[in-house]
Amino acid sequence: MSVPLLKIGVVLSTMAMITNWMSQTLPSLVGLNTTKLSAAGGGTLDRSTGVLPTNPEESWQVYSSAQDSEGRCICTVVAPQQTMCSRDARTKQLRQLLEKVQNMSQSIEVLDRRTQRDLQYVEKMENQMKGLESKFKQVEESHKQHLARQFKAIKAKMDELRPLIPVLEEYKADAKLVLQFKEEVQNLTSVLNELQEEIGAYDYDELQSRVSNLEERLRACMQKLACGKLTGISDPVTVKTSGSRFGSWMTDPLAPEGDNRVWYMDGYHNNRFVREYKSMVDFMNTDNFTSHRLPHPWSGTGQVVYNGSIYFNKFQSHIIIRFDLKTETILKTRSLDYAGYNNMYHYAWGGHSDIDLMVDESGLWAVYATNQNAGNIVVSRLDPVSLQTLQTWNTSYPKRSAGEAFIICGTLYVTNGYSGGTKVHYAYQTNASTYEYIDIPFQNKYSHISMLDYNPKDRALYAWNNGHQILYNVTLFHVIRSDEL
């Protein structure tokens, strides 16, 4: 076969492959074979549904909503794992699709240039073939004037080229098809650009602003949800069995991310050594710990670790000490004026538990009793740096009748005992200076609670119960009005 015929064959083969690829691959690229747009509510496209991500990990999810008898909206909202707004999945797909179409458009542009060049070559050959056909007819009419050998050569050449005439016609049709594809891709690119501008403007400008505003409102809502009214206490989880009947253990609610240390203090008086475990897992499974020696022995089980310091009541005194656990130095000491000590106003179980230090979402607290308040519980909020008393509330609940106490969101909760059947039955709200009697039972698994403290970071109660270190989860009730968001 001659070189021109080989070239035409290659071009035709390439065109067949391109035509087949365009008919099969292009619909899948633009989503025509898998995507169906539907209108919402009477033929109007629901754009808010169309552009929001379908992945629940990338969006705020409202799983249920209702109104109570007073018309307040009650809903369950699950926040995304990442705080930053991720771009819409459909818009990303649109951007990727547009890039593919643009790449395809460039490829078709190159193919079109080659096709036009080859088409010129084919048209030239077509003219040559027509000229040969005309010349052959002339030769047939005047064959007597030519030698038989020349006649046979021309006839053979014409017979070889004649079958290519319909093929060349088909090639010209394919060239028109390529041009049509080029125009359609250009139209599709234009539509996608307009769609991207429309969706992009909504998603990355208006939608981003709306989502950012929603995030701020929900973040404020979550901060409000950090506080609530205690409505339930879970069954206990025994973390470890260790030490004597009395003691305290805790984690730092202000510890930085990754700092999961556990602090352990056995006994309730005349002891100076604090154990530090690297993590809750180490605390549960090993006896590997670092020991810190305090400059003075502690009194009771009301110690707390807060922002890297341990706060404790100095033995046989009403002095509060702030001790830095990193530098192992005393940062501050201050007397808690009029507070009873040395088993004057202890909890019902005794144990020099006159002064009980606590932390909640708002900071550091001290619970104690004074003669001036007839031995009833006094609540004071302390400055965690200076230990200065910021504000004080006098309650009417006798300190010696309380089994244990803890503070959640500025509300003091008091148990009715420390052994046997136990419940939380008194609550004093410092924000309103009011109290109420409640009935929240919880399981006293080992029949002797000598320490019960709330950790606002874990939303859990830490307890020491007859030589067992225990955790309770708490349930808080929240009411957030829409005008508060």
From Swiss-Prot:
The keyword tRNA processing does not apply. It holds the Pfam family Noelin-1. It is found in: Secreted; Synapse; Endoplasmic reticulum; Cell projection, Axon. Disulfide bonds join C227-C409. GO terms for biological process: atrioventricular valve formation; cardiac epithelial to mesenchymal transition; negative regulation of gene expression; nervous system development; neuronal signal transduction; positive regulation of apoptotic process; positive regulation of epithelial to mesenchymal transition; positive regulation of gene expression. Residues 226-478 form the Olfactomedin-like domain. InterPro entries: Noelin_dom, Olfac-like_dom, Olfactomedin-like_domain, Quino_amine_DH_bsu. One of its GO terms (cellular component) is neuronal cell body. Residues 1-16 form the signal peptide. Residues 87-225 form a coiled coil. Its main location: secreted. SMART domains: OLF. Keywords: Cell projection, Coiled coil, Developmental protein, Disulfide bond, Endoplasmic reticulum, Glycoprotein, Secreted, Signal, Synapse. Glycans are attached at N33, N103, N187, N288, N307, N394, N431, N473. Homotetramer; disulfide-linked. Dimer of dimers, giving rise to a V-shaped homotretramer. Isoform 1 and isoform 3 interact with RTN4R. Identified in a complex with RTN4R and LINGO1. Peripherally associated with AMPAR complex. AMPAR complex consists of an inner core made of 4 pore-forming GluA/GRIA proteins (GRIA1, GRIA2, GRIA3 and GRIA4) and 4 major auxiliary subunits arranged in a twofold symmetry. One of the two pairs of distinct binding sites is occupied either by CNIH2, CNIH3 or CACNG2, CACNG3. The other harbors CACNG2, CACNG3, CACNG4, CACNG8 or GSG1L. The protein contains a globular N-terminal tetramerization domain, a long stalk formed by the coiled coil region and a C-terminal olfactomedin-like domain. Interactions between dimers are mediated by the coiled coil region. The dimers interact mostly via the N-terminal tetramerization domain, giving rise to a V-shaped overall architecture of the tetramer. Contributes to the regulation of axonal growth in the embryonic and adult central nervous system by inhibiting interactions between RTN4R and LINGO1. Inhibits RTN4R-mediated axon growth cone collapse. May play an important role in regulating the production of neural crest cells by the neural tube. May be required for normal responses to olfactory stimuli. This is Noelin. It comes from Homo sapiens. The lineage of its organism: Eukaryota, Metazoa, Chordata, Craniata, Vertebrata. The gene is OLFM1.
